A protein has these predicted regions:
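Long, charged N-terminal accessory/stalk domains
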Residues: 87-193, 204
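Conserved G1/Walker A P-loop phosphate-binding module
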Residues: 1-113, 122, 131, 141-142, ...
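Conserved short-loop catalytic and cofactor-binding motifs
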Residues: 78, 128, 296-297
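C-terminal-of-GTPase-core extension/linker across diverse P-loop GTPases
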Residues: 2-7, 12, 18, 146-356, ...
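Conserved nucleotide-binding/hydrolysis micro-motifs of P-loop NTPases
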Residues: 24, 50-51, 74-77, 105-111, ...
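Short, glycine/charged-enriched secondary-structure capping and boundary segments
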Residues: 21, 83-86, 115-118, 218-221, ...
Length: 367
């Protein structure tokens, strides 16, 4: 399951965003710093109209969407890397997620205090970036000291790791992230073991005023974009209004659509955030259909039928024979597996077949 950690300074809208994502009141959204002490965890459905269409056609007993796990982590402050505020708890929780959603305040409201004074998304961006880098710096320095001793004794694996760690250390000292150290197989392997924060993919959720939604943001969002670009970050920025999303979460059906239209937006910011997370991590969806259920599954783009089988159950991999495959568009056009077979649209693919986004798969296996 994809795990995204929601981070940011106190009072930027993290917990309000989390509440809207999970359509719950699990996260305390009071207007004071550190209202989220322990991380709140919520499982959110991945919005995908294709699953609803398959459900209409097949009419099984149930519909099972793909899901994303969001973790609302306590607000970070300057000095967290040295344990200030809730720094140590924050840093331990964030190391466990697949990617980071950095919520940046891009709105002004005198009733919502900012822990650092006036609204300044560039300053907030820099604080978060530097604290994560400082935390990683300590981890890398300690690991490098230990690994150098092993490398001097002639250990080839340790010698490779020293090269990677020295490159990472140089990037961190230059104010950049570990992700800038390259994407060689060795770098990926060693960095994964360390769980470095700045090696994790990141996207920005820019919390803007509701009035700025239709225009795609305002002056504060423009400044955040400039800051991200100046750091040469290839990170997507998703504008949203936590207040608007919280109100939208209370509505359903036509009321929901009307409320979106009134704000001049076509899609909830939360949906865009989830889709951005998928894109960031290189994920895609495939489907299985049957009398009991239609289900959406998540896998990495470029993954094989064998890998997809493992997403369902290890037995599917162990006894893999073939994957009977039909493209989503073809399945919807003819309406069923039976019709797809009759029209020669079902392909018998082996374990090395590269699954395409939206493929409808039926696995044949024997254990």
């Amino acid at each position: 399951m994809l795990r995204l950690g929601i981070v940011g300074l106190p009072n930027v809208g993290k917990s309000t965003l989390f509440n809207a994502l999970t359509s719950s009141k699990a996260a305390a959204a009071e207007n004071y710093p550190f209202c989220t002490v322990e991380p709140n965890v919520g499982v959110v459905e991945v919005p995908d109209p294709r699953l609803a269409r398959l459900f209409e056609l097949v009419r099984p007993k149930r519909k099972v969407p793909a899901v994303v796990e969001f973790v609302d982590i306590a607000g970070l402050v300057r000095g967290a890397s040295q344990g200030e505020g809730l720094g140590n708890q924050f840093l331990s929780h964030i190391r466990e997620v697949d990617a980071i959603v950095n919520v940046i305040r891009c709105f002004e409201d005198p009733d919502v205090v900012h822990v650092m004074g006036p609204v300044d998304p560039v300053r907030d961006h820099d604080v978060i970036t530097s604290e994560l880098a400082l935390a990683d710096l300590g981890v890398v320095e300690r690991r490098l000291e230990k690994t150098r001793k092993t490398a001097r004794a002639g250990d080839k694996e340790a010698q490779l790791e020293v090269v990677v760690l020295e490159r990472v250390l140089a990037e961190l000292n230059a104010g950049r992230g570990a992700r800038e150290a390259g994407e060689t197989d060795d770098a990926i392997r060693f960095l994964r073991q360390l769980g470095l924060l700045t090696a994790k993919p990141i996207l920005y959720a820019a919390n803007v005023n509701e009035d700025d939604l239709a225009a795609g943001g305002g002056k504060w969002l423009d400044r955040l974009r400039a800051a991200v670009q100046s750091h040469h970050e290839e990170a997507e920025i998703v504008p949203f209004s936590a207040k608007f999303e919280a109100e939208l979460a209370e509505l359903a059906g036509e009321e929901r659509g009307e409320y979106l239209a009134s704000a001049g937006v076509r899609e909830p910011g939360l949906d865009r955030l989830i889709h951005a997370g998928y894109h960031l991590l290189g994920l895609q969806t495939f489907f299985t259909v049957g009398e009991n259920e239609v289900r959406a599954w998540t896998m990495h783009r470029g993954g094989t039928a064998f890998a997809a089988a493992g997403e369902i159950h290890s037995d599917f991999q162990r006894g893999f024979i073939r994957a009977e495959t039909v493209a989503y568009e073809e399945f919807v056009r003819v309406g069923s597996y039976k019709a797809a077979r009759e029209q020669g649209l079902v392909r018998s693919e082996g374990r090395d077949y590269v699954v395409q986004d939206g493929d409808v798969l039926l696995f044949r296996f024997n254990v």
